[in-house]
Amino acid sequence: MPKMKTHRGAAKRFSKTGTGKIKMAHAFTSHILTSKTRKNKRNLRKGGIVAASDHKNISCLIPYK
């Protein structure tokens, strides 16, 4: 059976941790920031973990990462 292909767009956006969780960066941080509060922007800088409902689909996109 041939190797699975990695989805290159997903590989740039997600990475796996040592325990198997998938890390991601938050969206809504590039423009239109004046309407967002300081607290909101500060919390968006922190990384996030992909939800359990999305974990299976994203892990299929990045099988070797």
Swiss-Prot record:
Q: Which GO terms describe its molecular function?
A: structural constituent of ribosome
Tell me the Gene Ontology biological-process terms attached to this UniProt entry.
translation
Kindly give the Gene3D superfamilies that the UniProt entry links to this protein: 4.10.410.60
Name the keywords, alphabetized: Ribonucleoprotein, Ribosomal protein
What's a GO cellular component annotated to this UniProt protein?
A: cytosolic large ribosomal subunit
Spell out the disulfide connections.
none
Matching entries from Pfam families are given as: Ribosomal_L35p (PF01632)
InterPro entries referenced in this protein's UniProt entry, alphabetically: Ribosomal_bL35, Ribosomal_bL35-like, Ribosomal_bL35_CS, Ribosomal_bL35_sf
Alphabetized HAMAP family for the sequence: Ribosomal_bL35 (MF_00514)
Family to which this protein belongs: Belongs to the bacterial ribosomal protein bL35 family.
| PANTHER family associated with the record | 54S RIBOSOMAL PROTEIN BL35M, LARGE RIBOSOMAL SUBUNIT PROTEIN BL35M
Q: What is this protein called?
A: Large ribosomal subunit protein bL35
Per the UniProt entry, what species is this protein from, by scientific name?
A: Citrifermentans bemidjiense (strain ATCC BAA-1014 / DSM 16622 / JCM 12645 / Bem) (Geobacter bemidjiensis)
Annotated gene = rpmI
